[in-house]
Amino acid sequence: MSETTRAWPADTLARVPFWVYQDEANYHAELRRIFEGPTWSYVCLESDVAKPGEFRTTFVGEMPVIVVRGQDGGVHAFENRCAHRGALIALDDAGSVKNAFRCVYHAWSYDLRGNLIGIAFEKGSNGRGGMPADFCKADHGPRKLRTTTLCGLVFATLAPDTPPIEEYLGAEILGRVRRVMGKPVQVLGRFTQGLPNNWKLYFENVKDTYHASLLHAFFGTFRITRLTQGGGVLVSPDGAHHVSYTIGVPEDARSAAYREQGIRSELDGFRLADARLLDSVDEFNDRIQLQILTVFPNLVIQQVQNSLAVRQILPKGVEAMELHWTYIGFADDDAEMRQRRLRQANLVGPAGYVSMEDGCVGGFVQRGAAAASDEVSVVNMGGEGTESMDTRATEASVRGFWKAYRRYMGH
């Protein structure tokens, strides 16, 4: 498929053309230049593949991938595609094998590094048929991905020149990853959520601190995050990664700002029937009650009070995507903390008090801009730059996303 020849409308990060969410050729260029390019894609947790032979299947862009713990103790990743006729090698979301994967179609087999090691009836039957004598199994196999691990997270890349993960993230973002993922984790549950919008609309959404207490009335009503509270936005120098955070400090007279804006949740005096939902503790000892962290191009790490989750963004065509949620706690959590995390999982998730709205608004934009390919969105809140700010009344991290995106795409 030929690449799009459409140009960005102006040399600014504060205007984004709507065709970027709609153009088929541009989408296929994204898969090649971003997801198959020099980026680190999150693929699973280390605990998902804790023992030799344990595996998970996932995607890098639209490429199906197997991630497996090798007998050597390393984590390996390779394309989930049989070298014979292209069928999936592993069909389950997760599982365990002893020493090899076997394709169900023609029983070709692969070791835990993705090397082709066996061909059914390779020598034929009764002296007839079989593969050519000069067929070399080492020359055939699925594509291999390099892997790296950080704080229990597994990342993969197809590119030989992707920098080390620590360099890729930068010191400030790296420190915030370690803040939340600093101990061995335990998986509490998983969801898969289908969204009717381009993948970039969701990634913009989680980088957009401006909307959090406006779209999500629950956040504002119960003071989980409000623009009048403490906090800010950290943006990596290349724009690719970000952290937004809210510090639980008294708002004093500034709390009147939401009433003055006519925000409905501020006027109706809503209350929870069961206040235990918001029973939280300052487990990181820094008063940060909400932190959303993104790693370009497909990872979100969430801390909303004591609800911790890893979200994986998977593109599924121009106008669709999947969001894979993994709720986590720490291996040393006591029963009370585990129950608290499970209860607070009702805050943020596909059917939670908050994220139902995020599941809708991307589709609203996809539909609303359907006939506006040559028009642009306005991303001016907080100026036109991508610098970190000590306020969340800004779209700096959204502009940072487009800064990185344009660099990878050549726009």
Residue ranges and their predicted role:
Residues 1-7, 407-411:
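Basic/polar N-terminal segments that are highly enriched at the extreme N-terminus
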Residues 4-17:
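Short, contiguous pre-domain boundary segments
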Residues 14-16, 20-60:
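Non-catalytic accessory segments flanking enzyme active sites
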Residues 30, 81-82, 102, 202, ...:
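Short hydrophobic core segments
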Residues 32-40, 93-100, 113, 124-130, ...:
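Short, charged helix-to-loop "capping" segments that act as catalytic/coupling loops
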Residues 37-48, 126-131, 292-297:
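Short Pro/Gly-enriched beta-strand edge/turn motifs at strand-loop
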Residues 49-160, 167, 171:
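Rieske [2Fe-2S] iron-sulfur-binding domain
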Residues 69, 74, 145-411:
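C-terminal catalytic domain of Rieske-type non-heme iron oxygenases
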